[in-house]
Amino acid sequence: MANDQKNSESFPAKEDHKKDDAAAPAEVDHKDEFSASQPHPVENIVLVGRTGNGKSATGNSIVRSKVFKSKTKSSGVTMECHAVKAVTPEGPILNVIDTPGLFDLSVSAEFIGKEIVKCLTLADGGLHAVLLVLSVRTRISQEEEMVLSTLQVLFGSKIVDYLIVVFTGGDVLEDDGMTLEDYLGDNMPDFLKRVLILCGQRMILFDNKTKDDEKKTKQVHELLKLIDLVRKQNNNIPYTDEMYHMIKEENERHKKEQEELESKGHSEEQLAALMKELQIMNERNLKAMAEMMEKNMKIAMEAQEKLFEQREKAQEMSYQQKMEMQEKLKQMEGRMRAEMEAQMLSRQQCSIL
């Protein structure tokens, strides 16, 4: 603990993707280039969850700098994937990826498809941990269930092996004299029970409003221990899927062709025209991948809506009927997921070009 307190200073952070320079505070260190010569590896951490649950605030707490836009509004703030790198004391470099309200019921499948492709592009090397952000301030909603189901459908069922549940609102529980265990209690929603079982009970409570430096350091330190546990349990292998490899291959092809053009001695005018053609081709190929993800997302949404309809009907049944319906729902959910994964695998095996 003494060592944790000693290293309580802010982590130097660097934005990987930003369009609004005003979002970067003065304390962000832009001199650190995070080159391949860094002594510690880069670990990609992606934040997912319903809009308003505190994803951006959690990202700011992790990197110890206000680089992610964060407001306590139900409409949310972040509208595109955004990555920030931060050096942790005597630990890995974290590449923290904040996401828009992916899987929010109000967001289009087209937007989600594009943002997932962008997210996977930012996660060079694969995903080392997925943080599912929930809030103790709000009840578990259908959108939370949509997040988990869609994650499994789009990325495969193994994504839960990299899942950590982050509960925000630690200040609320502290004011009420409650621990996270007290909050979860005996009346835990079935969805939450299922999530915690799937992720091996990996969970943590975050207070994103605290001014206590020691507390800030401690909660990040505890999160790093969970991330390290995920890494060890997955044999140091980050999560990748077919879509990730397709994006990686496309970007590597684009980079290689750029280098070949630059080495052929074209005039500046010729080079600019050829580079523009290459860029158009790259954008077209990435757009095709985004459209594939959009189709997958629509499949997931339709299946989830059917599942919600069945659950609503189950609310009006007797206890025995509910038990029978729950068993049928589990079987139905399993079949839907298997069918969707089979359809997506079939699509992904088709040539995009």
UniProtKB/Swiss-Prot annotation:
MF annotations from Gene Ontology: GTP binding
GO biological process: response to bacterium
Residue stretches of biased makeup (Basic and acidic residues): 12-34
Keywords annotated in UniProt: Coiled coil, GTP-binding, Nucleotide-binding
Gene3D superfamilies for this protein: P-loop containing nucleotide triphosphate hydrolases
Region ranges (G3): 98-101
Database matches in InterPro entries: G_AIG1, GIMA/IAN/Toc, P-loop_NTPase
List of residues binding GTP: 49-57, 70, 208
Annotated region (G2), positions in chain: 76-80
Induction context: Up-regulated early after infection with P.syringae carrying avrRpt2. Up-regulated by brassinolide, cold treatment, syringolin, P.infestans infection and, at a lower level, by salicylic acid. Down-regulated by 2-aminoethoxyvinylglycine (AVG), high CO(2), isoxaben, and propiconazole treatments.
Domain AIG1-type G: 40-248
Pfam families: AIG1
CDD domains, A to Z: AIG1
Location of the region described as G5 in the Swiss-Prot/TrEMBL record: 207-209
Chain residue ranges for the region called G4: 168-171
Region spans: Disordered: 1-43
Residue span of region G1: 49-56
Tissue: Mainly expressed in leaves.
Record's compositionally biased regions (Polar residues): 1-10
Coiled-coil regions listed: 244-291
Protein family: Belongs to the TRAFAC class TrmE-Era-EngA-EngB-Septin-like GTPase superfamily. AIG1/Toc34/Toc159-like paraseptin GTPase family. IAN subfamily.
Name the UniProt record assigns to this protein: Immune-associated nucleotide-binding protein 8
Organism encoding this protein: Arabidopsis thaliana (Mouse-ear cress)
Source species taxonomy: Eukaryota, Viridiplantae, Streptophyta, Embryophyta, Tracheophyta
